[in-house]
Structure formats: structure tokens, C-alpha cells
Amino acid sequence: MFSSKRYLNSFGWEEGNALKEGGLTKPILTSRKYNTHGLGAKHDIADQWWDNVFSAQLQSIQVNTDNGKVAVQSNGVSTKLRMAKYHSKYSALSSVFRYAGRLCGTFEEDLVDKSLDSSVSPVSSKKVKVRKTSGKESSKREKSKKKKEKKEKKDKLKKKSKRLKLDDSHTQKRKRKVRDKESKKSSKSGLKKVSGTKKVKA
């Protein structure tokens, strides 16, 4: 079995002194579990502060058997209760959260008049977002939409005409090539050899 004392002694450690300046004077010992209690069970009962607070509050209640009435005697806040509040207030878990103001929406809501809300049945009494627009704004929107549509139509027509022109130019080039080839073939076939190198049309 591994002995930490023997290991440290091999480096020149003496009991009661640190191996280096400012170091530990005793070896670190690991805790071992030899009992049959569940995981997380602690030896110190004082850590169960909620149970202690509950029992302290139960002791402050007095029941009279003569009248059958229950009387609560308050002797001020017990030290255990104060400690419990302190622990719950400054626990590690609750210190993680940040408390801030309420988050608000990023846009404003215009609601329907309250006179309309009174005539509506209670089932459908939800607040409704209504955006009020003036006549000028709506006409501006319509004009801008019409302008966009006209522009899109013009762009489409331009693209289409360009495509047709390109197609026409390509077809005309092809037709010219075909005509040239045909004319060359016909000119070759129509010529006959006459006395050596001269060619005469027949």
C-alpha cells in the first residue's frame, strides 16, 4: 500500500515541516467511506439547519389542555432561524442569479378604445394590437407598390427583349454559316475542270 509519509521522506521531508517554504506541514489525507449510509450523508448533524429550525418553531407552540386552545408564544427570532435565513439568503445557488428590472417590449401597442371592450363578451376580452394609419400613409404605400410593380414589369420586358435579340443574332449567324456552307458546296459542284488549272463555271 502507498504511504504518503514514506514518499515525502524520500524527498527530504521531516514531520512538522513543509517540503518547501510556505507549503503544507502535514500530508493530504483522502476521506474514505466505511459505513453503509447513502451518498451525500454527512457526519455533522448541524448542517441540517432546516430540521433544527422546524423543531425550534414547534417548541414555541403551546397547547392548553384546559381550554383546548392553541397559543403561539413568540420569544423573538431564534438564533437558529436567523442562521437559516442567512444561509438561504447567501447560499451559493442564489448568489448566481441577478435581480434587475422588468424587461419591456421593443414596440408600442395601440389598443382598441375601452368603449369597445365593454361591449365585447368576457371570453374574448383579450387586448388586441391595432395599428392606426392615416389616409396619406395608405395612399403613399399604394403608390410605392405601384411604382415597384411598374419597375419590375419594365425590367422583365428589357430582359425578354435582350434575350430575343440575342436569340435573333445567334439564329442569323447560324443561317449565314449554313448559307455560306451551301454556297461553297454548290460552287464546288458547279465548277468543272477545263484544260489543266483553269476552272470555268458550267
UniProtKB/Swiss-Prot annotation:
Taxonomic superkingdom: Eukaryota
Key words of the record: Nucleus, Phosphoprotein
Spans annotated as Disordered: 118-202
Biased composition (Basic residues): 142-163, 186-202
GO terms classed as biological process: ribosome biogenesis
Locations listed in the record: Nucleus, Nucleolus
Residues the record lists as Phosphoserine modifications: 121
Molecular functions (GO terms): RNA binding
Record's GO cellular component terms: nucleolus
Protein name: Uncharacterized protein C1952.02
